[in-house]
Structures are given as structure tokens and as C-alpha cells.
Amino acid sequence: MYDQNHLAHRLRRASLGREDQLFLEHLVTGRETTYGQFFANAERLATGLVASGVQPGDRIAVQAPKTQIMLELYVATVLCGAVFLPLNTGYTASELRYFLGDAQPRLLVCDPRRAADLRAVADDCGVSGVLTIGVDESGTLADLRDAHQPGFAPVARAAGDLAAILYTSGTTGRSKGAMLSHGALASNAQTLRDYWRFTDADVLIHALPIFHTHGLFVATNVTLMAGGSCLFLPGFDADAILDAMPRATALMGVPTFYTRLLEAEGLAEAARGMRLFVSGSAPLLAETHDRWRAVTGHAILERYGMTETNMNTSNPYDGERRAGTVGFPLPGIEVILTDPQTGAKVPQGEVGILEVRGPNVFSGYWKMPEKTAEELRENGFFITGDMGQIDADGYVHIVGRSKDLIISGGYNIYPKEIELLVDDLPGVMESAVIGVPHPDFGETVVAVVVPEAGATLTEDGVLAGVADHLARFKQPRRVILVDALPRNTMGKVQKAEMRKTYADLFA
């Protein structure tokens, strides 16, 4: 079934012949949807999309609440050979103007509450039509689905054909549209399914957003390719997740999920029967890893990926899940470390730029051939921009982004080294180390620190706490105490924002 469509075939084949198996239970509404019902709805939508003028290769932009019908729309888009373009629900109309103008989608799907504002933007950008879907799953998208019957014949798509465009977070400069092929998405989900031992007996708690790689191409694709089930939440809800754990086997989350769940009563009992906890999208503190293990008896499995590649490395399912690392390269994926100036491989144990090659790597940046050539080598290696080390046991350590590297007085300083020391100080919840302009050194080190609740921290105390452990040129010149670090919607600390905030500290 769906044999001619590379990705759709692989999303469907695990559930063939098991139409009555539960695919999704919505934990807010209580509605249950079987695999047969889910794919029938996707086929209805695919028919409706084609009737609305969607052609193979057209983009379908989506900025709407997390609902089941959005997953149906994703599969429907794949079925009709179009390109799925999910957009962060936090983007303003002004921000959407850039994405719609750049991608030039055929259709935009949005929340009915924003339709009036976004129609004007869509019209200006040449979008042919606007469909709506609300958090209650009512709207013109649902009407389009319900007006058609199942039985859609999928459009033929090969492994190299485009399946999705995901825009990078754009924390520094213009967002880039990463083009992801049928083959890239299919191969990565199949690899993760096997590496993490997902089967049709698994029940995943799905609380991640679906405009992002983690929630859409990892959580959703892996579940579909395993023929498993998911317990579906519109967003993170600690109480709902705890209530669901006794019926579930796996949870995928960002570090914030785990820190908040650690504050909840009853975690140890709720998690007792779980099989797997996965963390990604932002670094997991070793302290969180250790506390989680102490409370639940489970070791969180941390992995490493990005918009352009999906997942690259993972701590092992069997074997030591080492805190502070992102494990080993996944099967079929090569990871090397190179010198940022020369491009030559660096010796084992030294810091270098992580480069990745494999079937998971994107096809390039949408309408940015020069940027593609800069970051995607002719030999297939993608220059991630992340700084890393590979230890003697083969575990990959992420040191930071190359753009976060601090060069002070001619010395290279890696923020992660300082952050680990600061985070270990009594009374520190977390920290972020940045470089800011300095009249003498070009750049200098500033530590932005969040104290633990009730702790009494001082700038002098933090400086004294790291002084004996760091060379003088690495020691922070200033410590800024704050209530919270700025983060994006996936929990990543926004160092670019902090660099702007404190740019004049030494002016």
C-alpha cells in the first residue's frame, strides 16, 4: 500500500492489516483513533488538497494549534506529493510574512482566531488560499476533510524528492529553510525505531510541539513506523504526563520536561513501568540526569540532532547512558571533528567542528545555493556549526556552538567548560557563559547565573568559586544574576539575545 510514495509507504506498512489498533488517544478530549481511521482521514484530506489545486512540489504552510488533524494533514501532504512546511505557533504576522514570501506556499493553514490578520499577509505573499483549524479541530480544514471519501491514490515520490521544509530557528540572522527529502525522513525514523527498540507494543506520551523536528519527525514518525500508539497532549502538562505514565512505555521531551516532572509528587511510582525516557533539543544538565535516575531508577537517553539532519547521535539503549554526552553516531551516520580554519580532522580528544554525513542529511537550503555550498561539502559532510569532542570511549560531547566561541586576547575559550564549573557551585541552578565586547581583549567572559530558589549568591562568591579551576584568561570578568535565562520555544538558551543585552557592559 502506498508503494510508489517513498515516505508514505514506510509510515503505513507497520500498521497494515491492523486497522483496529489504537494509533492515538487524545488525553484532553478522550477521543481514540485507530490506524484505519487515521489513514482514512489523511486520504480524505489528500483528496481535498488536490481538489483545492495543490500540485506535487507545492508547499503547504501550517501555523496552527497542535491537534490530531495536523498529523493527518502532514501525512496527507506526503501522500499528494506536496511539501509540508510547519511554522512555530509563536511567530507574529510580521515574522510570517518572511516565511510565506520565501517559501511561496500554495496554502496556509492557521488558527481561526488569527485568520483575519494572516489572510492579508497571505494575499500579499501570493498564497492561493487560507484554511483554518482551531484547538477544538473545527474549521475549514476539517470541513475539507469531511467533504471527501477515503481511497486516495498516492502520488509517486522517490527517496530524493522533497517532503518538508523546516526553517532554522534564526537566532542569529535570517532563518534558512532546510529541505528534507522523503529518504532523509524515512531513514532517520527507521534508524531511531530500531536503535531505541520501538515496537507495536509501545505507547508514547506525545507532549512535544509538532512544528519542530523532535515532535514531528522523531516522535510521530517513529510511532507510525513502529505501529505503536501515542497518548496525545496539546502541550506539556506535568499532571497529565504523570497520570499517563502507568499506561505508557516511553516519553520524549526537552530538558524542561524533566526538571518540572522532578518537582511533581508521585513521579517515582508513576515512572516505574516506563521503558524509555528520551531528551533532546537542548542540553540536559548532568544534575538533572543524576536526579532523574535517583528518583525513578531510569537513565534518561540523551540524543543530538538538528533541523538540517534530524538525529545524528544517541546514547545507547543498551550500555551506559553517560551524563553530559550525546552518545555515539547512529548506525549509518558518520560524525567527524574538523579544525574550523583548515577543515582538517582534529586528533581524538581535541575540540573541533562537528560534521555529519549520512542518509539523514538535508538536501540544502531553500533558495540559498551559496549558503548551501558554504555548509554542505561536496563530499556530503554537513558542517553543523557545533563544537564537540569525542572521548576515548567514543562518546560525543557537545562543547557549544562555534558562534558562541569566545576569543579573548587571542585565546580560544569554550563556554561549556566554564558553565560546568559554575553549575557545580552551591546555590546555582544553571548558567550561561557568553562573550561580550571588551576594549582591551576584543571579547571577555561574562557568566549569566540563575540561583536556586532560596539561595544567596553573590557575584564575588561565584568568581571565587571558579578562580582556582580556570586559567585567568578564562575566568569571568562579570557575573550577572538573573531569575531565568532567555529560551526559545524548544528550551534552547538564547545566547545571541544575551550578547545583545550585555553588549555595552564594558563600553
Task: Give the positions of each predicted feature.
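Conserved AMP-binding/adenylation subdomain of ANL enzymes
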Residues: 186-203, 211-250, 264-265
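Conserved AMP-binding A3 loop
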Residues: 32-36, 163-187, 494
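AMP-binding/adenylate-forming catalytic core of the ANL superfamily
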Residues: 91, 108, 358, 363-364, ...
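Gly/Ser/Thr-rich phosphate-binding loop
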Residues: 245-253, 262-322, 334
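ANL superfamily adenylate-forming
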Residues: 28, 113-159
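Conserved AMP-binding/adenylate-forming core of the ANL superfamily
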Residues: 23-67, 71-75, 92-97, 183
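A short helix-loop-beta submotif of the ANL/AMP-binding
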Residues: 59, 65-85, 89-93, 101-107, ...
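Conserved pre-ATP/AMP-binding loop-to-beta segment of ANL
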Residues: 20, 148-167, 174, 197-203
